[in-house]
């Protein structure tokens, strides 16, 4: 049974951090690694898409205590949990979809998204990435930490399974429910380049 995205995470808030750190492969490695790639200059402006409870920020703020972070998430409960962790930090939190929230122009030194963007098609991502590109300052960059489909067939299978479940439950295409539909690295790269990013580096 598919669940609406915000409700899915709110229903799992208790124990969420522990699940992410112990139940997701290599989480103890990719959260610190992601944080190490973010800017550390005093007052760096960082946008966190789908920030949840701020697990990546737990690793980032020790590296840049003066960072000014804007976090966007669908779940108000998740953001409230994040807020309690960082009462002394410069954080602006926005409840909403990062597809809909205005981001401005030349605002951020970097943007980051961890385990959040694997729910969307390439065509859905391109307008978002264009908006992100506009919101980044000169020499700004996006860090995307996520998992990807190994093959085109796997990517399409995820999408087909989602469409079948939506049809079974009578869910419209414009309704946002939780189901993983990761792209291949190649398709993700194509989306970023089409959106205007000059290059894509895969570690």
Language model segments and positions:
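A short beta-strand submotif of the Rossmann-like class I SAM-dependent methyltransferase core
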Residues: 113-116
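Class I SAM-dependent methyltransferase SAM/SAH-binding core
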Residues: 47-49, 53-100
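Conserved class I S-adenosyl-L-methionine
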Residues: 1-40, 55
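A short acidic, Gly/Pro-enriched loop at the edge of an enzyme's catalytic core
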Residues: 103-111
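A short glycine-rich, Lys/Arg-flanked "PGG" loop and its adjoining helix->strand segment in the class I
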Residues: 126-138
């Amino acid at each position: 049974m598919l669940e609406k995205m915000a409700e899915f995470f709110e229903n799992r808030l208790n124990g969420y951090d522990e699940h992410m750190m112990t139940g997701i492969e290599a989480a103890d490695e990719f959260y610190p690694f992601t944080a190490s790639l973010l800017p550390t200059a005093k007052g760096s402006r960082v946008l966190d898409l789908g920030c949840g409870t701020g697990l990546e920020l737990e690793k980032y703020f020790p590296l840049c205590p003066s960072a000014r972070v804007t976090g966007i998430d669908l779940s108000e409960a998740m953001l409230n949990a994040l807020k309690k962790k960082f009462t002394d930090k410069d954080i602006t939190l926005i409840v909403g979809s990062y597809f809909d929230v205005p981001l401005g122009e030349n605002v951020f030194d970097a943007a980051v998204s961890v385990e959040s963007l694997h729910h969307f098609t390439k065509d859905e991502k391109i307008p978002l990435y264009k908006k992100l590109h506009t919101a980044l300052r000169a020499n700004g960059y996006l860090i995307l930490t996520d998992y990807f489909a190994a093959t085109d067939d796997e990517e399409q299978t995820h999408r087909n399974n989602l469409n079948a479940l939506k049809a079974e439950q009578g869910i419209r295409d414009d309704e946002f429910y939780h189901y993983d539909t990761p792209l291949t690295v190649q398709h993700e790269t194509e989306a970023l380049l089409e959106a205007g990013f000059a290059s894509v580096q895969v570690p």
